Amino acid sequence: MKMANSLRGEVLKLYKNLLYLGRDYPKGADYFKKRLKNIFLKNKDVKNPEKIKELIAQGEFVMKELEALYFLRKYRAMKQRYYSDTNKTN
């Protein structure tokens, strides 16, 4: 029972982190929130601890991908701001 509670906490933490990251999703926060909720509800009946750990790892991978997407978008915007002016003057 102790393991199930710790996994439950990890799942909730993952959900909250993904929900937070979804605020800046390109298709909109509402779109991301609906998809996230559907995915978590689809897997709510999984009881096998190994399968739960696998799903958590998958969710953490998605988190890292989202972070990379956001960093790349910010980098591109910043690069465009700074380097677009120098190209126009030359």
From Swiss-Prot:
Mitochondrion recorded as keyword: yes
GO cellular component assignments: mitochondrion
Keywords: Mitochondrion
Alphabetized Pfam families for the sequence: Complex1_LYR
Location in or out of the cell: Mitochondrion
Keyword match Mitochondrion: yes
GO biological process: negative regulation of oxidative phosphorylation; respiratory electron transport chain
GO MF annotations in UniProt: enzyme inhibitor activity
Free-text function comment from the UniProt entry: Acts as a regulator of the electron transfer flavoprotein by promoting the removal of flavin from the ETF holoenzyme (composed of ETFA and ETFB).
Family: Belongs to the complex I LYR family.
Quaternary structure annotation from Swiss-Prot or TrEMBL: homotetramer. Interacts with NDUFAB1. Interacts with ETFA. Interacts with ETFB.
Name of the molecule in the record: Electron transfer flavoprotein regulatory factor 1
